[in-house]
């Protein structure tokens, strides 16, 4: 009689253990499927556009800590742009070196998350005679952000 109750008790615990393993496996499987369906955590999509509004060729070379966007030469009216997601810590920074001959040049912060995150999602910059103008979502009203260095 004692052996029979011990076998029943062992069988009972074994059944509970197997059912627990199956339930835990199903829960984990469901959680993994939900996680795979989610998109990775990223900031909002930001676009930066630089336009040459001068009569002279504009050389630009833009970089971030992780990306080198290369050197580009823009004629009057030409555009150069790129898009990116702002990082989780809001420390995204892009800077560009500009040159127009020997007289007009400079290296400027073109996108700094703690300055531009709420200012613009489509950030437009125009190189004009006196410097670099920044435009937010209003494409008509620009502000002189940077004077050309001499």
From Swiss-Prot:
<dbReference type="GO" id="GO:0060320">
    <property type="term" value="P:rejection of self pollen"/>
</dbReference>
<protein>
    <recommendedName>
        <fullName>S-protein homolog 24</fullName>
    </recommendedName>
</protein>
<keyword id="KW-0325">Glycoprotein</keyword>
<keyword id="KW-0732">Signal</keyword>
<comment type="similarity">
    <text>Belongs to the plant self-incompatibility (S1) protein family.</text>
</comment>
<keyword id="KW-0964">Secreted</keyword>
<dbReference type="Pfam" id="PF05938">
    <property type="entry name" value="Self-incomp_S1"/>
</dbReference>
<dbReference type="GO" id="GO:0005576">
    <property type="term" value="C:extracellular region"/>
</dbReference>
<feature type="glycosylation site" description="N-linked (GlcNAc...) asparagine">
    <location>
        <position position="122"/>
    </location>
</feature>
<dbReference type="InterPro" id="IPR010264">
    <property type="entry name" value="Self-incomp_S1"/>
</dbReference>
<keyword id="KW-0713">Self-incompatibility</keyword>
